[in-house]
Amino acid sequence: MEVAMVSAESSGCNSHMPYGYAAQARARERERLAHSRAAAAAAVAAATAAVEGSGGSGGGSHHHHQSRGACTSHDPQSSRGSRRRRRQRSEKKKAHYRQSSFPHCSDLMPSGSEEKILRELSEEEEDEEEEEEEEEEGRFYYSEDDHGDECSYTDLLPQDEGGGGYSSVRYSDCCERVVINVSGLRFETQMKTLAQFPETLLGDPEKRTQYFDPLRNEYFFDRNRPSFDAILYYYQSGGRLKRPVNVPFDIFTEEVKFYQLGEEALLKFREDEGFVREEEDRALPENEFKKQIWLLFEYPESSSPARGIAIVSVLVILISIVIFCLETLPEFRDDRDLVMALSAGGHGGLLNDTSAPHLENSGHTIFNDPFFIVETVCIVWFSFEFVVRCFACPSQALFFKNIMNIIDIVSILPYFITLGTDLAQQQGGGNGQQQQAMSFAILRIIRLVRVFRIFKLSRHSKGLQILGHTLRASMRELGLLIFFLFIGVILFSSAVYFAEADEPTTHFQSIPDAFWWAVVTMTTVGYGDMKPITVGGKIVGSLCAIAGVLTIALPVPVIVSNFNYFYHRETENEEQTQLTQNAVSCPYLPSNLLKKFRSSTSSSLGDKSEYLEMEEGVKESLCAKEEKCQGKGDDSETDKNNCSNAKAVETDV
């Protein structure tokens, strides 16, 4: 044994730490750690008791300072220093055991004991670090508030309702995310994105609350899924609304109305789609008498007398147009021309010697001409209608800017100009044959303007109004069509002229003469009065016809699309008007809703929510009526019929 010890010392082994001594050292180290942990737990308990007792009036300040002292003893710097010192001690232990290994002393230390000792030390070090981290999580922290610095102990970090830690309140206000479920398709965005438009459905927290699903913590909308991509992009882009290609226009418009993006966004979207801005609702006069007159002449659907006035106006317009056409017949035209020439003063070269004395002796003048009398009656009605509408209109400036009122003025003025000219010539006498012929030609041109009276029918025709809206919305396409035709006419007229220049019997004597042929060919009419003869001219004609088909076909689909839009919009307005009229005439509608819809000046429902409110009121009234019928057995036959037809009335509404 002594020989082994001596040999160990001589070989450089550290013989003062055999295997038994190393085990005793590890046991003492564990004991020391257990004592230190117990002391730390006692200190924590004392600090907790001090904090809880700090609320008392007597010893509040003492416990407060004591707790603060405890807090300062466990600041982050001291904890980091203790961890550093403990790590250094662990490294020293490892180095000590490496030096005290006995590679040549097999009798004192078993084989493999060195690796086992180092592994146990590493495990103890990891356990100590984990315990230190847990203790650090449970240490004291400072929270600053209005009352100063306070120290409290907790095992968890301070939490708030947003779950964001110390600064979670501000973080949740600006970066809180929201989930929107649209028919099973989930979208995720931030609250601040939706808050850019607080007047919309998604931007107003109160409006979107009714769609919130607390179980899944999301907002659910049973709406069109492809449309919501554009709706969400409206919030993300700051107000840009673009319809997806795979969504029809009417469906996307309904979605925009549902999410309450606003009238301005809807109007801008329609302008981007190529539609004109819709006319604003025409206001009614404030004066009650003017209001009734305005409704009588402007809104035929407002009452039965208004409908009767509209029928009379249409009949007068038709009579005026028929008279305008009949007076051009040969059997009426000769006599009327003679009367017009006679009233122009003198009959020099305009009347022959046999017809003039006959007309003068018979007393036949323009004032007793049957056509003139009928024309006068029509003009009296037109003038009366125009003056009354001008008197009762809400705004004189807007009244004279309306195209229909301008047409009324243009259709009335020729009569008074003709009448004034006739009276002036009769009083002044004849001033020469040339002046009389000039006056006669001017009167004919003025009388031609009466043909614009046919446009007065558009006031009472929905189809003509739709056509007018379509043409106004398609002005850009129509201008493009005319521009293409103009280029084609110039190009092919020049080409056919030079192609037919060497032909003596050609119809194209000049380029302007070929304009007519180019227009007729490009519009695929082909009268045949002018046609090319040479081979080159026929080739030019073929190309002209093909180019005309392509030129006309390009803008036509856009015009047809505009017509379909205005037609469907008018059809929907008529359906909503019918629903409103049925609702107002329904005997089961509550009195408050009935008064609301009767007081409405619009002929259609502006929002579906109003119709849903009306439908809900009808259902409540029907339920009350059914309960009344079931509770009373001796009701009259009328009440029984009303109760039995309750479902039918509900279906109609």
Curated annotation (Swiss-Prot):
User: Gene behind this chain?
Assistant: KCNA4
An example of a GO molecular function for this protein is:
potassium ion binding
State the tissue distribution: Expressed in brain, and at lower levels in the testis, lung, kidney, colon and heart. Detected in heart ventricle.
Task: Name the source organism.
Answer: Homo sapiens (Human)
Q: List the disulfide bonds.
A: none
Can you tell me which family this protein belongs to? Belongs to the potassium channel family. A (Shaker) (TC 1.A.1.2) subfamily. Kv1.4/KCNA4 sub-subfamily.
Topology in the membrane?
A: Multi-pass membrane protein
Which terms does the UniProt entry file under GO BP?
action potential; potassium ion transmembrane transport; potassium ion transport; protein homooligomerization
**InterPro entries attached to this UniProt entry:** BTB/POZ_dom, Ion_trans_dom, K_chnl_volt-dep_Kv, K_chnl_volt-dep_Kv1, K_chnl_volt-dep_Kv1.4, K_chnl_volt-dep_Kv1.4_TID, K_chnl_volt-dep_Kv1.4_TID_sf, SKP1/BTB/POZ_sf
Q: Which UniProt keywords apply?
A: Cataract, Cell membrane, Cell projection, Disease variant, Dystonia, Glycoprotein, Intellectual disability, Ion channel, Ion transport, Membrane, Phosphoprotein, Potassium, Potassium channel, Potassium transport, Transmembrane, Transmembrane helix, Transport, Voltage-gated channel
| Subcellular location, principal | membrane
Phosphoserine PTM sites in chain numbering: 90, 122, 599
Instruction: Provide Extracellular-side residue ranges.
Output: 327-370, 425-439, 498-511, 532-538
What job does this protein perform? Voltage-gated potassium channel that mediates transmembrane potassium transport in excitable membranes. Forms tetrameric potassium-selective channels through which potassium ions pass in accordance with their electrochemical gradient. The channel alternates between opened and closed conformations in response to the voltage difference across the membrane.
The places in or outside the cell where this protein is found are: Cell membrane; Cell projection, Axon
Q: Where is the composition biased (Basic residues)?
A: 81-97
Q: What cellular component GO annotations does this protein have?
A: axon; axon initial segment; dendritic spine; membrane; plasma membrane; voltage-gated potassium channel complex
Q: What is the lineage of its organism?
A: Eukaryota, Metazoa, Chordata, Craniata, Vertebrata
Give the stretches traversing the membrane: 305-326, 371-392, 404-424, 440-460, 476-497, 539-567
Q: What is this protein called?
A: Potassium voltage-gated channel subfamily A member 4
Presence of the UniProt keyword Chloroplast in the record: no
Q: How is the enzymatic or functional activity of this protein modulated? A: Inhibited by 4-aminopyridine (4-AP), but not by tetraethylammonium (TEA) and charybdotoxin (CTX).
Note the effect listed for residue 89 to Q: In MCIDDS; uncertain significance; mildly decreased function in potassium transmembrane transport
Glycosylation sites per record: 352
Outline the subunit composition. Homotetramer and heterotetramer of potassium channel proteins. Interacts with KCNAB1 and KCNAB2. Interacts with DLG1, DLG2 and DLG4 via their PDZ domains. Interacts with SIGMAR1. Detected in a complex with KCNA1. Interacts with KCNA2. Part of a complex containing KCNA1, KCNAB1 and LGI1. Interacts (via cytoplasmic N-terminal domain) with KCNRG.
